[in-house]
């Protein structure tokens, strides 16, 4: 009798030891790598499931969590990557991610988030990648990003942000890539970017900016790519890019109804390689346009005036093996002729070519 009882006790003990592990993988979910990866993609969840403390990746895409309450993830201290795309989230409470001090990736794309209040990202001191694109966010309150001292990439494209105010990025001093495409921005207040002077990539395309935000952008120091396409800009002022001119390599100004550059627009710009100017209303380029460093330039669908003022462009085109399809709109007798081939520049005095240093970085 003693032996069967001993076997029963051992069996019950073994079963009891297995129960926590079995219970750690939520129903209908898939768990991998010894419960470190938990996949609950589109399984009908309406509340955040309980998972093992050792979980590092939690994928909760395509479920239904209208509100992320305070401490929703408190029992997941080792989480590194959290996926909450397409979860119909409307509200993120203050302290919703409290306890996630190891989190590096946070995906909140394609939800219905309208308001983000200060405190929403408390404790996320290691967060490096934050995806908030395709929501309905209207503003960034001061202090919202303060805990995010290691943030590198912030995607806020496809929201409804109307204005960037001073202090909007307070605390996010290491931010390098900022995407604000397809919002409703009509202005950037002076001081709006004071806390993110190390931005390298800045996308502002498809907004409502009617004037170049000189005061705000003048605080940036190392921008390598600036995208302003599809904004109703008419002119670019003097010194527009000077504060980061030694770093700027790619500039997008296509589809803006742009009519002119001020003579000093490109002062201080020395490394520009790629410029997009197609589908505008440009007649001329400024005399200090940085052709020397330029590798690619898109020009089509502009009413170019083929006079001697455009001779720098003609010389640059002559040196290219590709043939950008840009044509003269005036004078009338040269209309429709390719800038590279037209006789419109016959008689113009071309400056002596400066030798370039061999090699590229």
UniProtKB/Swiss-Prot annotation:
Pfam families: LRR_8, LRRNT. LRR repeats lie at residues 78-99, 102-123, 126-147, 150-171, 174-195, 198-219, 222-243, 247-268, 271-292. Residues 1-24 form the signal peptide. Belongs to the small leucine-rich proteoglycan (SLRP) family. SLRP class IV subfamily. Residues 302-350 form the LRRCT domain. This is Chondroadherin. InterPro entries: Cys-rich_flank_reg_C (IPR000483), Leu-rich_rpt (IPR001611), Leu-rich_rpt_typical-subtyp (IPR003591), LRR_dom_sf (IPR032675), LRRNT (IPR000372), SLRP (IPR050333). Disulfide bonds join 25-40, 306-348, 308-328. It is found in: Secreted, Extracellular space, Extracellular matrix. Keywords: Disulfide bond, Extracellular matrix, Glycoprotein, Leucine-rich repeat, Repeat, Secreted, Signal. Residues 25-54 form the LRRNT domain. Cartilage. Its main location: secreted. Transmembrane segments: none annotated. Promotes attachment of chondrocytes, fibroblasts, and osteoblasts. This binding is mediated (at least for chondrocytes and fibroblasts) by the integrin alpha(2)beta(1). May play an important role in the regulation of chondrocyte growth and proliferation. It comes from Bos taurus. The gene is CHAD.
